[in-house]
C-alpha cells in the first residue's frame, strides 16, 4: 500500500507516520507535504497513492484545493482539529 501524508505540523506528521508503520511496516509513505502548492506539484509528478492522509488547513490554503485532481480510487482521510470543515470533508469522498 502507498500512502501520502499532507501535514504542515512536523510533530503531527511524525506521529501519523509512526502509527501507519506500526499498522503496516511494508507501507510506502511519502511526505509530509506542507503546502497546497507542494501537494499539487507532487500529485502531478507521481502516481496516485492508495490513500492520502490530509490536514485541511495548510499555510497557503486548504488541502481541498490541491486534491481536486486526485484519482477517484484514492481514499482520502482528513486529519484536522477544525470542526468547521467536517461537512465539506464528509462530502469529499
Per-region residue spans from a language model:
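Non-catalytic signal-transmission and effector/linker regions of two-component phosphorelay proteins
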Residues: 1-2
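Conserved acidic carboxylate
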Residues: 7
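Alpha-helix termination/capping residues and helix-transition junctions
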Residues: 24, 45-46, 92
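CheY-like receiver
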Residues: 49-93
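A generic structural motif
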Residues: 24-30, 34-35, 74
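Acidic, metal-coordinating helix/loop segments flanking the phosphotransfer/catalytic sites
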Residues: 17, 32-51
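Charged phosphotransfer/docking patches of two-component systems
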Residues: 10-14, 86
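Charged docking surfaces used in two-component/phosphorelay signaling
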Residues: 14-18, 22
Amino acid at each position: 500500500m502507498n500512502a501520502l501524508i499532507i501535514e504542515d505540523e512536523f510533530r503531527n506528521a511524525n506521529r501519523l507516520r509512526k502509527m501507519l508503520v506500526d499498522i503496516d511496516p511494508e507501507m510506502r509513505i511519502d511526505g509530509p507535504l506542507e503546502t497546497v502548492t507542494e501537494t499539487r506539484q507532487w500529485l502531478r509528478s507521481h502516481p496516485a497513492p492508495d490513500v492520502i492522509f490530509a490536514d485541511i488547513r495548510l499555510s497557503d490554503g486548504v488541502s481541498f484545493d490541491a486534491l481536486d485532481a486526485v484519482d477517484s480510487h484514492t481514499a482520502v482521510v482528513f486529519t484536522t482539529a477544525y470542526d468547521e470543515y467536517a461537512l465539506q470533508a464528509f462530502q469529499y469522498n
